[in-house]
C-alpha cells in the first residue's frame, strides 16, 4: 500500500546514501544529488495520481543507487536494478515526459558508475 511518508523516507535514504558514499567522486555526488532533488518533485507530483508507481520508481532508484555505490561492485545486479529503474517509468512517455527523461538520465549515470 502506498504512503506519501514512505515515498519521502525512500528519497531521504537515497540522499543519505549518496552523501555518505565513499565510492563517488565529488562531481558524481553533486550531479546525482541534483538529479535526486528533481526526481523528488517529479515523483511527488506523480504520486497524486499513481502512488504505487511513484513508490516503485523511488524503490528502483534506491536499489540502483545501492548497487552503483557499494564498495564491492556486482555488475549484473547493477545492470538488473538499472533495467528495473528504466522499466518503472514505461507508459509515462506522453503524460510525464520530463519524469521519463530524468529517470533515464539517472539510470545512465548510475550504470556508467558501475563500469
Over which residues does each language-model region extend?
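Short terminal alpha-helical segments
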Residues: 1-33
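A structural signal for well-ordered alpha-helices, especially hydrophobic packing surfaces
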Residues: 15-18, 22, 39-47, 61-68, ...
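Strongly charged, low-complexity linkers/loops
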Residues: 64, 68-86
Amino acid at each position: 500500500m502506498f504512503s506519501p511518508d514512505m515515498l519521502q523516507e525512500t528519497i531521504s535514504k537515497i540522499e543519505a546514501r549518496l552523501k555518505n558514499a565513499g565510492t563517488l567522486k565529488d562531481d558524481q555526488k553533486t550531479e546525482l544529488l541534483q538529479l535526486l532533488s528533481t526526481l523528488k518533485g517529479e515523483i511527488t507530483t506523480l504520486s497524486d495520481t499513481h502512488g504505487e508507481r511513484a513508490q516503485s520508481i523511488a524503490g528502483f532508484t534506491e536499489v540502483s543507487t545501492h548497487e552503483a555505490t557499494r564498495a564491492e561492485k556486482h555488475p549484473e545486479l547493477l545492470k538488473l536494478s538499472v533495467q528495473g529503474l528504466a522499466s518503472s517509468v514505461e507508459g509515462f512517455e506522453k503524460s510525464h515526459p520530463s519524469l521519463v527523461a530524468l529517470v533515464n538520465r539517472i539510470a545512465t549515470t548510475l550504470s556508467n558508475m558501475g563500469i
